[in-house]
């Protein structure tokens, strides 16, 4: 039977947090951010396995968190690579061979909802690839090289992409392997498919599905958690 697998990418160093501790290990309400993220997927009935990708020297720390909080479904903890795309590729190679849909998610997004996860799987089964996100609340400007505003896109045409980003496993693996062969750089996994002419369906995420990357995000995260509990 085919599986739905999730790759949690926890290999970032969190330089923007101005902390010696990687952002995924910082705490909200006395529990590490990574705990909340892992829990969302481990308790979701449609998720069959979790592959956690982290810094090589943090593998033991991640194992301790998993054991301490009795988080299940984590099949492997694997070391990350030099860039995020390398870490994702390591995760792709580690998922079960019978994986059909793979979700790729930032460890520092602890407030992903059950509906976002479920819809990602559903739309991927329908379209082959799907990513959640939100329409920007602010007006967006395009500026010239000299710093002047030259255009104002319609907000309805813009989309702030979040994670999970969800894919047919064979499609995303094939595109990642081509990416390595051609030595191309990308900033997220939807770009991996876009590089090879593949379409990604964009569906509604949630404004609370934030990525915690700055001290201000940590404060906002505490407020979001207060509302959820």
Curated annotation (Swiss-Prot):
Molecular functions (GO terms): 2-C-methyl-D-erythritol 4-phosphate cytidylyltransferase activity
Pathway: Isoprenoid biosynthesis; isopentenyl diphosphate biosynthesis via DXP pathway; isopentenyl diphosphate from 1-deoxy-D-xylulose 5-phosphate: step 2/6
E.C. code: 2.7.7.60
Gene3D superfamilies: Spore Coat Polysaccharide Biosynthesis Protein SpsA, Chain A (3.90.550.10)
Stored CDD domains: CDP-ME_synthetase
Marked site positions, Transition state stabilizer: 16, 23
Keyword Hydrolase: no
Site (Positions MEP for the nucleophilic attack): 155, 211
Keywords, sorted A to Z: Isoprene biosynthesis, Nucleotidyltransferase, Transferase
Function: Catalyzes the formation of 4-diphosphocytidyl-2-C-methyl-D-erythritol from CTP and 2-C-methyl-D-erythritol 4-phosphate (MEP).
Family membership noted in the UniProt record: Belongs to the IspD/TarI cytidylyltransferase family. IspD subfamily.
UniProt name for this protein: 2-C-methyl-D-erythritol 4-phosphate cytidylyltransferase
Naturally occurring in which organism (per UniProt): Clostridium botulinum (strain Okra / Type B1)
Protein encoded by which gene: ispD
């Amino acid at each position: 039977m085919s599986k739905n697998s999730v790759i949690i990418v926890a290999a970032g160093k969190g330089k923007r947090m101005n902390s010696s501790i990687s952002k995924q290990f910082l705490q909200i309400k006395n529990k590490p951010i990574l705990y909340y993220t892992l829990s969302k997927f481990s308790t979701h009935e449609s998720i069959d396995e979790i592959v956690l990708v982290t810094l090589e020297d943090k593998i033991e720390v991640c194992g301790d968190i998993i054991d301490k909080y009795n988080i299940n479904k984590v099949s492997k903890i694997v070391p990350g690579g030099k860039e995020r795309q390398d870490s994702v590729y390591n995760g792709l190679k580690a998922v079960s061979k019978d994986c059909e849909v793979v979700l790729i998610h930032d460890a520092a997004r602890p407030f992903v909802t059950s509906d976002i996860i479920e819809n990602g799987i559903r739309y991927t089964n329908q379209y082959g690839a799907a990513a959640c996100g939100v329409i920007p609340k602010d007006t967006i400007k395009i500026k010239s090289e000299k710093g002047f505003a030259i255009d104002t896109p319609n907000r309805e045409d813009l989309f702030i992409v979040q994670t999970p980003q969800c894919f047919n496993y064979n499609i995303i693996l094939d595109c990642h392997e081509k990416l390595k062969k051609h030595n191309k750089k990308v900033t997220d996994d939807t770009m991996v498919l876009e590089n090879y002419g593949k379409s990604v369906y964009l569906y509604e995420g949630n404004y609370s599905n934030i990525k915690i990357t700055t001290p201000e995000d940590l404060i906002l995260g505490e407020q979001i958690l207060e509302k959820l509990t």
